[in-house]
Amino acid sequence: MEQLTARQTEVLQIITRHLETCGYPPTLREIAAQLGISGTLGVMKHLEALEKKGYLRRQEGSTRGITLCNQSQAASLPIVGVVRAGLLHPAIQDIEGHFAIDRSQLASGGAFFLRVKGDSMVHAHIVEGDLALVRPQPHASNRDIVVAMVDGEATLKRFYREADRIRLQPENPNYEPIIIEKGEQEVSIVGKVVGIYRQME
């Protein structure tokens, strides 16, 4: 399939979410409302482009005549709160939206996205505003990039286990590593970062 523009991706996500939550596709006006536009002409152009690229089929004369191609291959994952790539940040919570990806990219259930804030992981090519795809798991191997909870606060860092301590290493020399000595602080692994998604302007 051809690559989508950012706006076409947004339209496809709106349709996918509506199908998953309501069981039927949205109308043109419902799509327009979620895009923040008043008319439906722009929506029709996006749908036409999506149809030409093979992402959906339209049924003329029906207000909800949209069918996704390979619908079973799409997965709409929650974007959960914010994780700060830098300083520690209050615990992960709150769903701020959803983002659709190909189901083949998921090795297991329960995956979710976290939106990155801060610049402590820039040398790992993770920047502010990125969506980090997190696979929930309670353990990590050395050099894994993880979302970790330290004393109830979440951070995104590279994981190292060293003798009697854990080191959460930033990928930016302007930041110090977080060192957790055995028994000093409570630390748990929320999950491993298995992908980064970025919207291009």
From Swiss-Prot:
Residues 28-48 bind DNA. The keyword Hydrolase applies. Gene3D superfamilies: Umud Fragment, subunit A (2.10.109.10), Winged helix-like DNA-binding domain superfamily/Winged helix DNA-binding domain (1.10.10.10). Keywords: Autocatalytic cleavage, DNA damage, DNA repair, DNA replication, DNA-binding, Hydrolase, Repressor, SOS response, Transcription, Transcription regulation. SUPFAM superfamilies: LexA/Signal peptidase, Winged helix' DNA-binding domain. It catalyses: Hydrolysis of Ala-|-Gly bond in repressor LexA. CDD domains: S24_LexA-like. GO terms for molecular function: DNA binding; serine-type endopeptidase activity. The active site is at residues 120, 157. The record marks 85-86 as: Cleavage. GO terms for biological process: DNA repair; DNA replication; negative regulation of DNA-templated transcription; proteolysis; SOS response. Its EC number is 3.4.21.88. HAMAP family: LexA (MF_00015). Represses a number of genes involved in the response to DNA damage (SOS response), including recA and lexA. In the presence of single-stranded DNA, RecA interacts with LexA causing an autocatalytic cleavage which disrupts the DNA-binding part of LexA, leading to derepression of the SOS regulon and eventually DNA repair. Belongs to the peptidase S24 family. Homodimer. This is LexA repressor. It comes from Citrifermentans bemidjiense (strain ATCC BAA-1014 / DSM 16622 / JCM 12645 / Bem). The lineage of its organism: Bacteria, Pseudomonadati, Thermodesulfobacteriota, Desulfuromonadia, Geobacterales.
